[in-house]
Amino acid sequence: MSYITNNTISLSFKSLRLELILFLLLFSSCSSSVYLLDKKPHWVDQGYELHVNNLVKKANSKPNNPMHQINATKGLTIHSFGFAMENADRLIIDDYKSGKDLYASAHKSFAHAVIFGNKSLSLKYPGYIDWISGDSELIPNFNKDDIENLYWTAGAYGGAIKSSRGDPKWVILLPRIGRLLEAALSLDPNWNNGSLYVGMISYTMIRHDAPLDKELVATDFFNKAVETSKNLDASPYISLAENVCIPTQNKNEFTNLLYKALNIDMHAEPDLRLTNYINQKRAQWLLDNIDEFFY
């Protein structure tokens, strides 16, 4: 007797669809990922969430493996920023409660990402926890292989703080982002097309000990990021627009930066194609909702 029901068949096809999407996201060209994001964003969300769940399971099953820990951190952070936070930013304008609930959901994922990120580094460096918590000034002997761990752990902290919506117990941890990014910068400042410089744009503007000329410092990081990426990455433009132009209410520069981001050739650098697609979608959304940010 067969126990396959219509519901089982439906679930099987759904599972196969998600596995196919997951394959395209992870192993196919960026063009395939861009196409799916453009045409079927919900499918991509589901497919990547399945991938992240698998990464988290591996990290939990092998808690002493630094690679599994950082993979979980990276997966959770990418998914939470790329889907949950993006959707929350849009939703909260029209439906405050639903948007707030989505931020809370993203925050849980970021909090888990922070735990995995800290674990990935503490397994390699016993003094890491004392250093990151500020109890010790002795910087662990990081090397270039640790930059990815440092970067994604900083990203997880940034996401957790932003999605906490001002929760003091998370805001007080802001200096940890700086320690992680500055440690990575000391190893290879031009890593990954200037990603560390982009991270420093936002951190410079919100750090507790921000310099009086923080806008100029952030702009300097912006210029370095643009130079390092050969002006092929939209990320610096989005970051400067959101983190500097909105707080200073510089609407003209905000608009100028976002149009420059939109004019970047998404296909010029294959490694940046997916990132640029996501950032250009955000740039257009920011322009469409400009009155929400300037008064």
State what each model feature region is:
Residues 289-291, 295:
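Eukaryotic intrinsically disordered, low-complexity segments enriched for acidic and Ser/Thr/Pro residues
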Residues 62-68:
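A short, structured loop/turn motif at beta-sheet edges
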Residues 283:
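Acidic-aromatic/histidine active-site loop/patch
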Residues 33-57, 61, 75-183, 196-228, ...:
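Short coil/linker segments at helix-helix boundaries
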Residues 63, 125, 189-191, 230-231:
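Short coil turns that delineate tetratricopeptide repeat
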Residues 3-20:
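Bacterial N-terminal signal peptides that target proteins for export
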Residues 27-29:
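C-terminal motif of bacterial Sec signal peptides marking the signal peptidase cleavage site
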